[in-house]
A protein has these predicted regions:
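Residues within membrane-spanning alpha-helices of integral membrane proteins
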Residues: 7, 14, 52, 72, ...
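Membrane-water interface at the C-terminal end of transmembrane alpha helices
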Residues: 109-121
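Membrane-interface elements of multi-pass transporters and channels
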Residues: 30, 34, 38, 67, ...
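Non-cytosolic membrane-interface motifs at loop->transmembrane helix junctions
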Residues: 38-45, 95-105
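Membrane-helix boundary connector in multi-pass membrane proteins
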Residues: 64-66, 73, 84-102, 118-120
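Membrane-embedded alpha-helical segments of multi-pass transporters/permeases
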Residues: 25, 63, 87, 112-115
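Membrane-helix boundary elements
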Residues: 6-45
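Core segments of alpha-helical transmembrane spans in multipass integral membrane proteins
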Residues: 18-25, 43-66, 74-83
Length: 121
């Protein structure tokens, strides 16, 4: 993978996490409804907002042309594990939201590309 492709891969990951994080902070119930197809329980808004803040932090850590190696590893791990969890939830019927499959497959694609980038160089 060329340096420019690598920068764009991690920048795309950062943009997606920043957007998702901001959405979770501003309208957590809507995001969770789209992903899981069910309303949040008591305190769920607060947990979703806290998770949104963590995604904002991850996005900021990977923003720009100089995404540090440790930040790249963190983003790679997050995308890989998020793919497994979201797709597993969808397959088992735990999550039935409109966006669970697209989100799971997006994380799978990004995580796979990041793993390939990490171990092919």
């Amino acid at each position: 993978m060329t340096k420019l492709s690598r920068i764009n891969l991690y920048k795309l990951g950062a943009i997606l996490e920043l957007a998702t994080g901001a959405a979770l902070v501003v309208c957590p119930a809507l995001v969770m409804q789209l992903l899981f197809g069910s309303p949040l329980g008591s305190g769920g808004d607060h947990v979703a907002q806290l998770y949104g803040l963590a995604l904002l932090g991850l996005g900021v850590a990977c923003w720009g042309d100089s995404c540090a190696d440790q930040s790249q590893k963190g983003l790679m791990m997050y995308n890989s594990v998020a793919a497994i969890v979201l797709i597993s939830f969808a397959v088992r019927g735990i999550a039935a939201g409109l966006m669970v499959w697209p989100a799971g497959l997006m994380h799978l694609a990004l995580g796979s590309l990041m793993v390939w980038d990490r171990f092919s160089s």
